[in-house]
Amino acid sequence: MEEKKQTQKKEICQYSKRCGGCAFQGMSYEEQLEQKQKTVKKYLKKYVKPDTIVRMYYPYHYRNKVAAAFGRLRNGTFISGTYEEGTHRIVPIESCMIEDKNADRIIGTIRGLLKSFKIKTYDEDSGYGLLRHVLVRVGKKSKEVLVVLVLGSPVLPSSGNYKYRDQCQ
């Protein structure tokens, strides 16, 4: 019991309390596996006998699909991240311990380009703005990357000018 209390104090993610994307990060990896196994068993035991969850060698940066909301602070700084659980407030996240590193870099690059391309982020309250979300999917074996821009308008202004290529290769 004492060991469990200590492992729950070790937060490796500074955003975990607000973003809700990695609910198990406050536990040791072994405890995470136990909890996930119990959950799978609880919901599937009526239908099948679930196999034991396979351990990862390195349990970080494994998430191959990353969705980021974009917004702007009152001081004009562009932010990207996830919505705080149960709200429309964006938790600004620079990098995430469970998201693919290339996906994080791509989202950071897009965030950095917003000002130079004069792109307005979508405001949920006013319904005004262009960029709502970005979805990045990374093929772990193929290394292919899919980037989806979710816009608040069917028209992408000056779309012929977007010939930027990220250095994530």
PLM segments and residue spans:
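Accessory RNA-recognition modules of RNA-modification enzymes
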Residues: M1-Q169
